[in-house]
Amino acid sequence: MAGISIFGLLPFTSPDIVAVNVSHIFLQMALWRSSDNLVYLPPTPVSKVLSTDDYVTRTNIYYYAGTSRLLTVGHPYFPIPKSSNNKVDVPKVSAFQYRVFRVRLPDPNKFGLPDARIYNPDAERLVWACTGVEVGRGQPLGVGLSGHPLYNKLEDTENSNIAHGPIGQDSRDNISVDNKQTQLCIIGCTPPMGEHWGKGTPCRNPPAQGDCPPLELITSPIQDGDMVDTGYGAMDFTALQLNKSDVPIDICQSTCKYPDYLGMAAEPYGDSMFFYLRREQLFARHFFNRASAVGDAIPDTFILKSNGGGRDVGSAVYSPTPSGSMVTSEAQLFNKPYWLRRAQGHNNGICWANQLFVTVVDTTRSTNMCLCVPSEASPATTYDATKFKEYLRHGEEYDLQFIFQLCKVTLTPDIMAYLHTMNSSLLEDWNFGLTLPPSTSLEDTYRFLSSSAITCQKDTPPTEKQDPYAKLNFWDVDLKDRFSLDLSQFPLGRKFLLQLGVRSRSAVSVRKRPATSATGSTAAKRKRTKK
């Protein structure tokens, strides 16, 4: 009888098994530890934004629409209130303001169409697509000056021979500049967005008196009358320059905005900017430094002080005066047609909500008209400057022309859900309502809502549709009665037909006189011979 012993088991005996040598086996369990590396989940898929070409069908019907001559006149630097109250008597009209036209279009679904069979009103809706635009500008080219009678100027740092000593209490001077030259045109179906630097909110304790405030980049819609960047930066001068002397008077109490091209280009649906035209020109004309105490002192490691009683270090807060230089008709962006074939975003020119926003800036026609009138009733016989009054006015002239293409949208369930996600008011404008799922909770409904015996009930929402841009200021242009199919009767329409290669036939047929056949024989000429 032999015995077998295995580690971990009790020995047992068997008469039929011979003795076998078995070595001991030791099993050691490993301790599992989680990895110190971060576990990254797969990225969330980005919701796909469709191009309007994927669900909008274009027809071969084009309309022309144009405005009348649009004029505006005012003071180029500031609004002038009435003497009796604070109402504005003369508005501020400057070439360095944005002109944002809100163009209202007729509803194509309620429009008199040449052929009613082009779409099915039960399953389709009509929309406008902007395919051509021309922004006309009147008035001659000119340069309008801006400035400040008390401009914060300490020294001419370009031509100064020696730095000045301690600054006085008031070293301001009367300085005028010709601002930065800008030509801009933005087309979209929502207002354009602008950006500027404003006063931010500190994270900890508020800054002490005299400390530099934090800055914040603010994005807001560009409205009609907002100031453009004139060469001093896009910032809120009212909140960030409290001395009211660092910039010209036309912007010292304003906010200069710069178009947020990056934000509008990254917009998912591409409604605020179908395309844009831009030309900017600027150079520094004069170089000054600022008065007042320097907030950020120059470190001692940056300069070497002179021996003995050296002079004080001057102000290192430098600031140039801008200049837009020469204006010329060869560099004009206006008074010429532009055809929209492919937009930069997903919206290829579709005018949702039957409206279009045209943003224009043109500083090449910035002439300020000087008006002089006598202050006395008697006619002047000799010149006396005290007997005359000088006034400033600025006038602008615009003309907008468009070519619109009639398009239709097939309202499938997927397209309707997509449009509702993009803009929920579109389906409401098309008389489509959404049925909300029934509520599973028990709600209270009182019978007499106006009774004083019950608690005050919530006000019912207004039935009228609210204008989302009611609180914004735009130049409203109504084109609901200015659409025409006769493209050949309008300047932009003829240019559009010409670039399509379509010739308009004359309505008057010209009758040609048939050639008469010669019945008689012509006499042969005798050949001259020299004798």
Curated annotation (Swiss-Prot):
Annotated region (Disordered), positions in chain: 511-531
GO cellular component, as recorded: host cell nucleus; T=7 icosahedral viral capsid
GO BP terms, alphabetized: endocytosis involved in viral entry into host cell; virion attachment to host cell
Principal location class: virion
Keywords: Capsid protein, Disulfide bond, Host nucleus, Host-virus interaction, Late protein, T=7 icosahedral capsid protein, Viral attachment to host cell, Viral penetration into host cytoplasm, Virion, Virus endocytosis by host, Virus entry into host cell
One Pfam family named in its UniProt record: Late_protein_L1
Listed Gene3D superfamilies: Major capsid L1 (late) superfamily, Papillomavirus
GO MF entry, a single one: structural molecule activity
Compartment list: Virion; Host nucleus
InterPro entries listed in its UniProt record: Capsid_L1_Papillomavir, Capsid_L1_sf_Papillomavir, dsDNA_vir_gr_I_capsid
Lineage: superkingdom: Viruses
The family this protein is said to belong to: Belongs to the papillomaviridae L1 protein family.
Function: Forms an icosahedral capsid with a T=7 symmetry and a 50 nm diameter. The capsid is composed of 72 pentamers linked to each other by disulfide bonds and associated with L2 proteins. Binds to heparan sulfate proteoglycans on cell surface of basal layer keratinocytes to provide initial virion attachment. This binding mediates a conformational change in the virus capsid that facilitates efficient infection. The virion enters the host cell via endocytosis. During virus trafficking, L1 protein dissociates from the viral DNA and the genomic DNA is released to the host nucleus.
Subunit structure: Self-assembles into homopentamers. The capsid has an icosahedral symmetry and consists of 72 capsomers, with each capsomer being a pentamer of L1. Interacts with the minor capsid protein L2; this interaction is necessary for viral genome encapsidation. Interacts with protein E2; this interaction enhances E2-dependent replication and transcription activation.
Name of the molecule in the record: Major capsid protein L1
Annotated gene: L1
